[in-house]
Regions:
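N-terminal Sec/SRP start-transfer signal
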Residues: 1-13, 244-245
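Amphipathic alpha-helical recognition patches that constitute DNA-binding helices
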Residues: 2-3, 10, 27, 69, ...
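Alpha-helical transmembrane segments of integral membrane proteins
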Residues: 4, 115-119, 124, 128-148, ...
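Membrane-interface helix starts
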Residues: 8, 12-16, 70, 308
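Residue-level signal for discrete positions within transmembrane alpha-helices
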Residues: 14, 114, 118, 154-161, ...
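Hydrophobic alpha-helical transmembrane segments of membrane transport/permease proteins
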Residues: 18-75, 179-200
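Membrane-water interface segments at the C-terminal ends of transmembrane alpha-helices
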Residues: 27-31, 155-185, 213-219
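An internal, D/E-rich "acidic patch" concept
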Residues: 65-134
Length: 341
């Protein structure tokens, strides 16, 4: 019962934060010097008399509700106030994410394919990164001060210091230009109409180089963090006691020390998973992948602010869900942290 109350309380906090962030983001995008009504009539400007154009412009502004204050427009956009044209609630909370002025489609139709691609590449990048950094960090902590540990520390510092776009350019030159192992860009074999697993492997092949870049870019920080957490855990008194009692080293490391190191590592893992959604903006543009990051940059360049705002809200929801998962994970992995307390 206490767990349920805690979860409900946390969800209530997240809903409050969601509304605050969404209002701030809506106000921020409304400060951008752009007029949707004028943009919509721009193609007709030369064919209309100035007075006719101005009358149509004012009528369209009134029809679109642009003459209302920002609070009224936010409530209408969110779905808390009735739409001016239909008289019904038809906003974000009802599933209406707006209309893309550039693609001439509903925002939902525009963002569905890129969302799938972004989630696909980020999940695989997370699996690869964790599969390398956790064993590597544990091994370096156990063999602290050894040659391999010293080499890894130097290597991770170098990797951590290099911006992700530099890593991407270097890897493109090595693996795509020199070795020709992977394609430079794209999301599938041109002209191919694969289905099933063949389509999956073809897509994975084209995503391989971006995945390698994202994984390599994460090795430095994550490996050092896991190593540091494990060194702290191995220095605890109960670990020394377990070793003094003759407990097997593998049991000491993986059953006792790793469990204590897991709490800060969980924060890192989930936080990093959320950060690569924003980091994928660079990767998707570098490799010309049809993902949320590339779509977001395109929306800003094309002054498609309803689309950009919807993408920003997607990142907000992902971050809030991640924060909830972190809080709930603490009580699951560490007996010292209990939700009912």
């Amino acid at each position: 019962m206490a767990v349920t109350k805690y979860i409900l309380r946390r969800i209530a906090y997240l809903i409050l934060v969601f509304f605050i962030v969404s209002f701030l983001m809506y106000c921020l995008y409304n400060l951008i010097p752009s007029d949707p009504a004028r943009n919509q009539l721009e193609g007709m400007k030369k064919s209309l008399k100035p007075e006719v154009y101005e009358r149509m412009y004012q009528e369209l502004r009134e029809e679109m509700g642009l003459n209302d204050n920002v609070l009224v427009r936010y409530a209408r956009w969110m779905g808390l106030s009735a739409d001016k044209q239909t008289g019904k609630l038809h906003g974000l909370l009802e599933g209406n994410f707006g209309y893309s002025s550039y693609f001439k489609k509903n925002v939902v139709e525009v963002i569905l394919p890129p969302i799938g691609n972004t989630i696909f590449i980020n999940i695989f990048a997370t699996i690869l990164a964790l599969g390398i950094t956790i064993p590597l960090g544990i091994y370096c902590a156990v063999h602290k001060g050894g040659k391999f540990d010293n080499f890894t520390q130097v290597f991770t510092i170098i990797g951590y210091s290099i911006p992700i776009y530099i890593i991407a350019l270097v890897f493109i030159y090595i693996f795509a230009v020199l070795l020709r192992w992977f394609p430079v860009s794209g999301m599938g074999t041109p002209g191919a109409e694969y289905t099933g697993m063949r389509a999956f492997w073809d897509k994975l092949y084209y995503f391989s180089l971006p995945l390698i870049v994202m994984t390599f870019g994460s090795l430095g920080g994550m490996t050092r963090y896991v190593r540091s957490a494990m060194i702290d855990a191995l220095s605890m008194d109960h670990i020394k006691t377990a070793r003094a009692k003759g407990v097997r080293e593998k049991v000491v490391i993986y059953s006792h020390a790793w469990r204590n190191a897991l709490l800060p590592v969980i924060t890192l893992i989930i936080g990093w998973f959320l950060s690569i959604f924003s980091g994928s903006v660079i990767i998707e543009n570098t490799f010309n992948l049809n993902g949320m990051g590339k779509l977001y940059i395109g929306a800003l360049n094309n002054h498609d602010y309803e689309l950009a705002l919807a993408i920003q809200m997607f990142y907000t929801v992902v971050s809030l869900i991640g924060a909830l998962v972190i809080d709930l994970s603490y009580g699951l992995v560490d007996p010292r942290v209990r939700i009912d307390k």
